[in-house]
Design a protein with these regions (language model features):
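Extended, helix-rich architectural segments
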Residues: 1-330
C-alpha cells in the first residue's frame, strides 16, 4: 500500500512539475554517491587509520630480522595516554558539561532548567563520559572522532497471549491504534441449551488472541560513531559543504522493524554476512568483529546493511539543491 501511495505521489508531482525527480532517479544518484564515498573510505582512508592503530598498539612492522632487536617503540600510545586525562578533565571535571546563561532576570529559571535537562540527557541518559572518551581517542589515534546526536524514533513492541476475551473486550482492544490482534481461536462460552436452540440463539463466543502493542519510545540519542562507519564525499572540506554525509552500519531485522520498517521487506534484504568485514580498519581495530561463531537461525536477528545518508540534491527541479535524508537498506 505504501509503495502504491509513493508511486501515485511521484506521478502527481511529475504532472505538476516535469523537472521533478522520481524515486528511481533519486535512488541512482544516492547509490552512486554512496558507492564513491565507500570506495574513498575503504580504499584510501581506512588503510591509513589501520596503520595508525598498529602504531598505537606497538605491533611489529613485519621487517624484523633474526638476531636483531624486536623492540617496538610505544611513543604513539604513550603520547595518546598522556593527553587523554587532560582532555577528559576539561569537559568532565565539573558537574556541568553544558551551562545555559540567562540574558535577563526573566530567563534565570529557564536557563537553570535547560542546564539541568541537557546535562541529564548527555551524562545520565547517554553515558556522555564514554561517548567523549571514545571520540577523543579516535581523533588522537585515527584522525577522526565522530559524535552523532539525533532523535531516536524507535518503538517498543510487547506481545501478549490473551485468553477468554468476550466480544466487548475484543472490540475494545481492537479500537486501540497501538495494538494489532491475531485471533488464535474462538469458541462458545458455554454449551448451547435446548431452549436456546429452539429460539435460534447461539452461545456467546470467547476468543484467544495474540496482542502486539507497539508504543513509541522516542529519546535524544548521543553516540560515538566508529570512524569506519562514517562516510563523506571525497571532495568535501567539511561536513557543511559535503555533497554527501552518511552513517553506515550493520543492524538486525529486529532493529529495522522497531524503527517502523516493513518486516517482510526487511527479511527479504537480510543475510548472514557482514559487508563491513572487508574493511581493514575495522579488522585492525577489533578482529573479533569479523569472526562469526554461529549463524542465527531466527530471521529477526539476521543482518542488514543500513545507511543513513544526508545528500544535497535538486529533487523538485527548482535549480537549487536541498539537503535530504535518504535511508538505504541492502
Amino acid at each position: 500500500m505504501e509503495n502504491e501511495i509513493n508511486d501515485l505521489t511521484n506521478e502527481v508531482n511529475e504532472l505538476i512539475n516535469p523537472d521533478y525527480m522520481d524515486d528511481d532517479e533519486l535512488q541512482g544518484i544516492v547509490g552512486a554517491e554512496i558507492d564513491d564515498a565507500i570506495d574513498f573510505i575503504d580504499n584510501t582512508v581506512s588503510p591509513i587509520r589501520a596503520k595508525a592503530t598498529e602504531y598505537y598498539r606497538g605491533e611489529p612492522f613485519g621487517d624484523e630480522e633474526d638476531g636483531r632487536s624486536q623492540v617496538v617503540s610505544m611513543d604513539v600510545r604513550d603520547t595518546v595516554q598522556a593527553i587523554m586525562p587532560s582532555l577528559m578533565r576539561i569537559f568532565t571535571s565539573g558537574d556541568k558539561v553544558v551551562e545555559f546563561v540567562p540574558h535577563g532576570p526573566e530567563d534565570v529559571a529557564m536557563a537553570k532548567q535547560a542546564t539541568e535537562y541537557v546535562n541529564y540527557i548527555f551524562q545520565k541518559d547517554n553515558q556522555g563520559f564514554l561517548v567523549m572518551h571514545s571520540a577523543f581517542k579516535d581523533a588522537l589515534i585515527r584522525k577522526n572522532g565522530v559524535i552523532k546526536f539525533y532523535w531516536d524514533e524507535s518503538y517498543e513492541t510487547q506481545t501478549s497471549e490473551l485468553t477468554g476475551l468476550d466480544d466487548m473486550a475484543l472490540a475494545t482492544l481492537s479500537g486501540d491504534p497501538t495494538v494489532s490482534l491475531d485471533i488464535v481461536s474462538s469458541y462458545p462460552a458455554f454449551e448451547q441449551t435446548e431452549e436456546m436452540a429452539m429460539l435460534g440463539q447461539e452461545a456467546p463466543l470467547l476468543h484467544d488472541v495474540r496482542a502486539t502493542r507497539r508504543m513509541p519510545k522516542g529519546k535524544v540519542k548521543i553516540e560515538a560513531v566508529p570512524p569506519e562507519e562514517f562516510l563523506i564525499d571525497r571532495r568535501a572540506k567539511s561536513i557543511e559543504d559535503a555533497q554527501l554525509v552518511a552513517h553506515r552500519r550493520v543492524v538486525t531485522v529486529s532493529d529495522l522493524v522497531a524503527m517502523g520498517y516493513d518486516r517482510d521487506e526487511m527479511e527479504s534484504l537480510a543475510s548472514d554476512t557482514d559487508e563491513m568485514d572487508m574493511n581493514v580498519e575495522r579488522y585492525t581495530r577489533n578482529p573479533a568483529l569479523t569472526t562469526s561463531t554461529a549463524d542465527r537461525t531466527d530471521k529477526a536477528m539476521r543482518k542488514v546493511s543500513y545507511i543513513e545518508a544526508y545528500i544535497k540534491v535538486d529533487r523538485d527541479g527548482d535549480g537549487i539543491a536541498e539537503l535530504r535524508k535518504v535511508c538505504v537498506a541492502a
